[in-house]
């Protein structure tokens, strides 16, 4: 998604190693992170760790709220859940974007929808859900939504549009690699969305937040 003027970059969690983080440009940028991850950004000038429901006002038009997700954190055998995980709600110029990082489905999204909805645009994972027999089901994962669960979350958030992400880049699970976007599109109407408001992008494809959010 192209950068909107005044709206900074959101880096989807890519299991970044410390070397990659050190090589990011713009060391004077404001960095917003879940709790206990600031140690990886020591060379940055403005690092802000956030607990669930913390809000940070970046400027007069931009506010970010860190919200719960149904997931976990782990980088080694000894640090399970030692850092926080979650979703970012970005409020910009009167519009709301929910950037759902890795998450499973849960009732928390009904609560988030009641408190913060309606959401204008939701980004949510739709792939990496078949880990059978490591997990008991072939079609769902506790920590990654399948396409239908992603749409149910977007429905609970009262989202106007939803973008499916976290699919088709790396083979992490056993579902066919092109299954998530097909199911995502096919299930749109069932969850109250027009097909044109359920969006899928190819690797390297660009779009404009201004267009997606309906800014004139």
Name each region found by the language model.
Residues 12-24:
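Acidic/His-rich segments in extracytoplasmic proteins that coordinate ligands and/or metal ions
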Residues 40-51:
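Helix-loop-beta element that forms the nucleotide-linked donor phosphate-binding surface
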Residues 50-117, 203-216:
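Core dinuclear metal-dependent hydrolase active-site scaffold
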Residues 9-12, 75-79, 99-102, 138-143:
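Short, flexible loop segments at the rims of nucleotide/cofactor-binding pockets, characterized by
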Residues 1-11:
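Single conserved hydrophobic/aromatic residue that forms the stacking wall/gate
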Residues 19-20, 30-32, 36-39, 106-201:
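Cap/insert and terminal regions of metallo-dependent hydrolase folds
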Residues 5, 90-101, 120-126, 186:
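Metallo-beta-lactamase
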Residues 24-30, 95-97:
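Short active-site oxyanion
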């Amino acid at each position: 998604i192209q950068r909107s003027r005044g709206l900074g970059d959101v880096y989807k969690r890519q299991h970044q190693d410390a070397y990659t983080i050190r090589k990011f440009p713009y060391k004077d940028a404001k960095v917003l992170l879940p709790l206990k991850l600031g140690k990886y950004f020591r060379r940055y000038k403005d690092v802000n760790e956030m607990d669930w429901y913390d809000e940070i006002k970046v400027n007069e038009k931009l506010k970010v709220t860190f919200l719960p997700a149904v997931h976990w954190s782990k980088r080694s055998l000894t640090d399970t859940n030692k850092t926080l995980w979650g979703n970012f709600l970005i409020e910009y110029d009167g519009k709301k974007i929910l950037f759902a990082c890795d998450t499973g489905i849960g009732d928390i999204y009904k609560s988030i929808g009641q408190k913060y909805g309606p959401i204008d645009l939701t980004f949510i994972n739709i792939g990496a859900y078949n880990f059978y027999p490591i997990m008991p089901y072939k079609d769902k994962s506790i920590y990654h939504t399948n396409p239908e669960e992603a749409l149910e979350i977007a429905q609970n958030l009262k989202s106007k549009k939803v973008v499916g992400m976290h699919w088709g880049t790396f083979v992490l699970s056993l579902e066919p690699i092109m299954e998530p976007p097909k199911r995502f599109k096919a299930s749109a109407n069932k969850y109250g969305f027009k097909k044109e408001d359920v969006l899928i992008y190819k690797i390297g494809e660009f779009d404009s937040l201004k267009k997606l959010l309906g800014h004139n």
